[in-house]
Amino acid sequence: MTLLEGSVGVEDLVLLEPLEQESLIRNLQLRYEKKEIYTYIGNVLVSVNPYQQLPIYDLEFVAKYRDYTFYELKPHIYALANMAYQSLRDRDRDQCILITGESGAGKTEASKLVMSYVAAVCGKGEQVNSVKEQLLQSNPVLEAFGNAKTIRNNNSSRFGKYMDIEFDFKGFPLGGVITNYLLEKSRVVKQLEGERNFHIFYQLLAGADAQLLKALKLERDTGGYAYLNPDTSRVDGMDDDANFKVLQSAMTVIGFSDEEIRQVLEVAALVLKLGNVELINEFQANGVPASGIRDGRGVQEIGELVGLNSVELERALCSRTMETAKEKVVTTLNVIQAQYARDALAKNIYSRLFNWLVNRINESIKVGTGEKRKVMGVLDIYGFEILEDNSFEQFVINYCNEKLQQVFIEMTLKEEQEEYKREGIPWVKVEYFDNGIICNLIEHNQRGILAMLDEECLRPGVVSDSTFLAKLNQLFSKHSHYESKVTQNAQRQYDHSMGLSCFRICHYAGKVTYNVNSFIDKNNDLLFRDLSQAMWKARHPLLRSLFPEGDPKQASLKRPPTAGAQFKSSVTTLMKNLYSKNPNYIRCIKPNEHQQRGHFSFELVSVQAQYLGLLENVRVRRAGYAYRQAYGSFLERYRLLSRSTWPRWNGGDQEGVEKVLGELSMSSEELAFGKTKIFIRSPKTLFYLEEQRRLRLQQLATLIQKTYRGWRCRTHYQLMRKSQIVISSWFRGNMQKKHYRKMKASALLIQAFVRGWKARKNYRKYFRSGAALILSNFIYKSMVQKFLLGLKNDLPSPSILDKKWPSAPYKYFNTANHELQRLFHQWKCKKFRDQLSPKQVEVLREKLCASELFKGKKASYPQSVPIPFHGDYIGLQRNPKLQKLKGGEEGPILMAETVVKVNRGNAKTSSRILLLTKGHVIITDMKNPQAKTVIPLNSLAGVSVTSFKDGLFSLHLSEISSVGSKGEFLLVSEHVIELLTKICRATLDATQMQLPVTVTEEFSVKFKEGSLTVKVIQGPGGGGTGKLSFKKKGSRCLEVTVQ
């Protein structure tokens, strides 16, 4: 049973029954499998990463959720964003949206969805749209430079981001401020197996054109850079080439100039090239170990790229200057130290470039002073991380998550308590785990782990990670949330998973083991002064600005604050900022470790739900009353349960709610009436209300159906009755009208006859007998004479092509007019024929024969109509040698041309000469005129030809023919229309019989060995050229393709 009809599982976990960890996870799983990834815990949104694009984020959904309140539609991130925005705009309360969860749980995507929704609903206008576009386009820039592929997430944020979006009093965006936290700069020089460096390096190499790569002195192959993992250069579902173009467009929209974009890419290229600087062992003259650069070309290219003296850079990488108030001492660095210096420089350049980018974006989107602003903060910060090898970065990341969990617990309880106080409802204390003891363990000013780390970094003498661990073991040996090998041994606990250089903290999310190796180094975060000064001397404006401490005039011997101290200060500031705003929570959950769509790991989600405190959050929400709703909304939903409030209620909302609940006889212990809301203690009571509402809806539906059916039947009856009356009246009227018209026509006819009879009777005495016939004949002859004289004057031209003919003036002349037209056309044709010479007559007869044979049957016929039939296409009359081919044959040569003979055995072709006389068809070889075949026309049984534009045809012989011992002939002619026309006419003249011509795409040719089936098909070109290609298909089939 659910709160809303048709929902999947329970949409609000506050209403879950029974309330247990397993049922909570099962409900999330059920909804996830139905692609319902959002679930509420009161006003907290739980989001399970679907690892796929869902069709629930288009403009239709934006419009839907902006018009409804939080609980009126299905759970959605737009509902939470809309609630936060409306609270900011209408109630003037600053908001913050806290997005938390593991790496890969979808926090970055959630923050982008929140920003896109707010941008879509917060007003329009040229200036407003410009501000919204700049805020949205900051995401691609920060993702390119701050996100990377990790083992668990292909687009993991490796920095923390908090954005304050500022609005005016109308809710229109004015600008914003971005704050970043602890970029994971160690990733610049080293990544775990299966991980990538920051996206920008791969986008630059994949998306930059050849000219830009040449200017940056880079090559496209990622395998040529020491700082990039070659095995993971590509990521499924990520197009680095396209993303680079998106990055360039985003930087332009934000306000970066072309020169600034070029300088940013040059600094990124400098980091890549620094990784390829290879250092080797060298020794000074006194035998002291030193270092040098194997190939100076790389350093030289770096110098050319950023305007840096390569000699000074090499000196800064391979030596160090120790400076006190009185003297300077230069010491050489061995290879390990030089490599450390090179990597430290690369990390610092990239980290400072990232900070510069954030500041540059802030300059573009910042709001002018003097305006009153409302603020909505969106926090997208690294999720809780538990890796196989956890170092300093994981320690501070998890510390930040501890602080956020503390904020969540305190502000959730605070909000719940304040709502009860506002409504006058007694508050019931809820037991929950307070992680303040863990936060205090890490951040205490005198005895916290961070304080001990700073103290160890500043302590004179030999300082190492092991001395730091020893101090922690001494201070926290009895702390309930701290463990190490030493403390376990003291308590006689034996854990083989705990290393000697490790300590463990029992976080709210679970136990995490940290390896102290490099803690001191990463906390110091020192960069040798020689390297800062070398970078400051570069002629590159951006690179120079990143190292202000390199300026000798601003040189200071004061030690900079440690990384841990800076991060602790930033987190403290962030917490103060969050406490000053109204919180909105999005708890992101990763459903599986392999980023697979549709796969839900019950165990993994259980662990996340446990450390996110989802069950405790539900219990807090249900501490006093599981469900609460404004009187107006509650009455609107349930007023149908009382006859007093249904269908109309004119009283107050609270009074109406009391009427409804009073008639249901519900226990007073289950209800509490606040000032503006009704509170219900247990979900069972709410489910009872929903069940009663469902039953009542069925009753009302039945009533509505009954009423509707009755109304429809009455309406139909009334309409039919009205229609019958209208039809009857029209029918009767029409019948009367027809009867009246018939009676009137009859009366007029009788009157006409009577008047005629009377007129004839009265005037008969004045006329002679037969006068009418004489007059009518005279009139008719006059009309005929007029028609013929008019026709004589309007006769068309004597051209047989002119089809015009004047129409008859009267209908009874139509027959005569058509006959005259026919006679005139015959006369014109005779006159035309009398003018023709015998040769022209013969030509036209051949064309007429061709038309009868091929018109509408062969595609090449229309092209042959305007072309005269020449007959001789080989120059027979001018070549005596060719005339000998005729032999003893008498009479003229009707047709002479070169044809192609198709070999029946291998489908190969060869040229032949074909002669047509009045009695024979002669086929002979051009090279051997003696080898000829003479076919009498009376031996021909028929001709087969295709309907395409080709010249292929077959001469079929009669069965009694003695000619062609090898069989019938398959030939190709360029003048097939003319040739076959002449053969048919010659055969008719010689045998007085018509030669059959078959137009078909498949015919049989008989040979000595048997028959061969010829199949003609049209090629992909549509047969426009008429070219043929032959292909043998077995021994009995030949396939011909017309190109």
From Swiss-Prot:
Q: IQ domain spans which residues?
A: 697-719, 720-742, 743-772
Annotated GO MF terms: actin filament binding; ATP binding; calmodulin binding; microfilament motor activity
- Chain ranges of the TH1 domain: 858-1042
Please describe the post-translational modifications of this protein.
Phosphorylated by ALPK1.
**UniProt keyword list:** Actin-binding, ATP-binding, Calmodulin-binding, Motor protein, Myosin, Nucleotide-binding, Phosphoprotein, Repeat
Cite the CDD domains for this sequence.
Answer: IQCD, MYSc_Myo1
| KW ATP-binding (keyword) present | yes
Task: Locate the coiled-coil region(s) and give their ranges.
Answer: none
Instruction: Enumerate the residue ranges of region (Actin-binding).
Output: 571-593
The reply to whether Transport figures as a keyword in the UniProt entry is no
Which GO terms of the cellular component aspect does the record hold?
actin cytoskeleton; basolateral plasma membrane; brush border; cortical actin cytoskeleton; cytoplasm; filamentous actin; lateral plasma membrane; microvillus
Residues the record lists as binding ATP? 101-108
Query: What GO terms describe the biological role, i.e. biological process, of this protein?
Result: actin filament organization; actin filament-based movement; endocytosis; sensory perception of sound; vesicle localization
* InterPro entries noted in UniProt: IQ_motif_EF-hand-BS, Kinesin_motor_dom_sf, Myosin_head_motor_dom-like, Myosin_TH1, MYSc_Myo1, P-loop_NTPase
Annotated SMART domains: IQ, MYSc
Where do the Myosin motor domain residues begin and end?
8-694
Q: Which PANTHER family match?
A: MYOSIN, UNCONVENTIONAL MYOSIN-IA
What this protein is reported to do is described as:
Involved in directing the movement of organelles along actin filaments.
Similarity annotation:
Belongs to the TRAFAC class myosin-kinesin ATPase superfamily. Myosin family.
Name of the protein in question: Unconventional myosin-Ia
Lineage at the top is: Eukaryota, Metazoa, Chordata, Craniata, Vertebrata
Q: Which gene encodes it?
A: MYO1A
